[in-house]
Amino acid sequence: MKIAVFCSANKNIDPDFFTLTEEMGKWMAENGHDLVFGGCNSGLMDCIGKAVKANGGRTIGVVPTLVERGGRTFPDLDIEIPCDNLSDRKDLMLTQSDIFVALPGGVGTLDEIFTIAAAHTIGYHHKMVILYNMKGFWNSTIALLDDMAEKSMIRGDWRDVIEVAENLEELAKLCKG
């Protein structure tokens, strides 16, 4: 399975996020899952790429030209897919991936989550987004989605499009379908 991972490129975050991300990368490689990611050499993106490669897995980086020109490309990509901008990157990641996992991240990660989820709700695809809720990172986002649903701003149950995994075991089960 090709698992797209959305996550932070920031280095200055809770060290536990790096530890949990390494565990996920190891699990992905050991279970034959390919990593599809933004292909950056920083933060959790770098961490997941290194963990997958260190355990014999395959990395597919969808790299915007701005990242490439800035010398911020993950150095050990098996496949590099160049793209013009972040919108192209999301579109290419959608076509390249079977499922999406969101690790802790910022505005870019939120953009990726909601772009994929919105496309699902409209019917462009039927791929799931999983919020890997490391240390409760996504709790406020989950509360926001619940509040929006309560106010009838979301049709149906948002959990039909976005699922939540509290730990690696739950994540593994959700990835198996």
Segment roles from a protein language model:
Residues 1-96, 132-176:
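A cross-family phosphate/adenosyl-ligand binding-site feature
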Residues 59, 124-127:
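Short, structured loop/turn "capping" segments at alpha-beta junctions
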Residues 88-123, 130:
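Active-site/ligand-binding-proximal alpha/beta "capping" segment
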